[in-house]
Amino acid sequence: MKYTLTRIDPDAPVERYPQEQRQTVDDPLAQEATRGIMMGRLEEVLKDTVNWGRKNSLWPYNFGISCCYVEMCTAFTSPHDVARFGAEVIRASPRQADFMVIAGTPFIKMAPVIQRLYEQLLEPKWVISMGACANSGGMYDIYSVVQGVDKFLPVDVYIPGCPPRPEAFLQALMLLQDSIGKERRPLSWVVGDQGIYRPQMPAEKERKRGERINVTNLRTPDEI
């Protein structure tokens, strides 16, 4: 599996992903396994254990911009029970959260605020873009709206819809958990940048294309 190595570069010029450099590399564990089967296997078990704890205790930052935030809050009610995914502990400060959801329209005036809040998140941190406005600007193709938060933030999961249903938010959490379970982060006490290895997850549209092409009996909207 190919991985994307992300490194922090404070001196980098302002680009699409500020303060980050990305490159495609091979699985780092495969390289470590050549040193010895025992040590390679032990490191793999340790990484899987740490990732299991991270993906099952995701604390979201309580932050909303527009109407998609209402659907996000609905996912925290008892009919949907987001606590099943360990993401019910909403934090009022980004310094105590694991990920943030950009739920709403990212106006240009809000972009510096969103970026500042993202920088206050402690590593490891993730971003979910929720709704058409956050993904691509939606119907607001105007001067005052950023055409997608990925213009100034690294996004891990995109949720389509205007607005998305709460079930879509829960699916995004499961996709994020799947991605976190395959991440490779350094297991050492060294303070400083050592890089983050993230798997290249396929788009759901591409993953389900074959299944959708093979459908012969189309269901009506009330049956979906």
Curated annotation (Swiss-Prot):
GO terms for molecular function: 4 iron, 4 sulfur cluster binding; iron ion binding; NADH dehydrogenase (ubiquinone) activity; NADH:ubiquinone reductase (non-electrogenic) activity; quinone binding. It comes from Shewanella oneidensis (strain ATCC 700550 / JCM 31522 / CIP 106686 / LMG 19005 / NCIMB 14063 / MR-1). Residues 203-212 have a biased composition (Basic and acidic residues). It is found in: Cell inner membrane. Residues 214-224 have a biased composition (Polar residues). Its cofactor is [4Fe-4S] cluster. One of its GO terms (cellular component) is respiratory chain complex I. [4Fe-4S] cluster binds at residues 67-68, 133, 162. NDH-1 shuttles electrons from NADH, via FMN and iron-sulfur (Fe-S) centers, to quinones in the respiratory chain. The immediate electron acceptor for the enzyme in this species is believed to be ubiquinone. Couples the redox reaction to proton translocation (for every two electrons transferred, four hydrogen ions are translocated across the cytoplasmic membrane), and thus conserves the redox energy in a proton gradient. It is an enzyme of class 7 (translocase). The gene is nuoB. Belongs to the complex I 20 kDa subunit family. Binds 1 [4Fe-4S] cluster. Its EC number is 7.1.1.-. Residues 201-224 are annotated as: Disordered. Keywords: 4Fe-4S, Cell inner membrane, Cell membrane, Iron, Iron-sulfur, Membrane, Metal-binding, NAD, Quinone, Translocase, Transport, Ubiquinone. GO terms for biological process: aerobic respiration; electron transport coupled proton transport. PROSITE patterns: COMPLEX1_20K. This is NADH-quinone oxidoreductase subunit B. It catalyses: a quinone + NADH + 5 H(+)(in) = a quinol + NAD(+) + 4 H(+)(out). HAMAP family: NDH1_NuoB. Its main location: membrane.
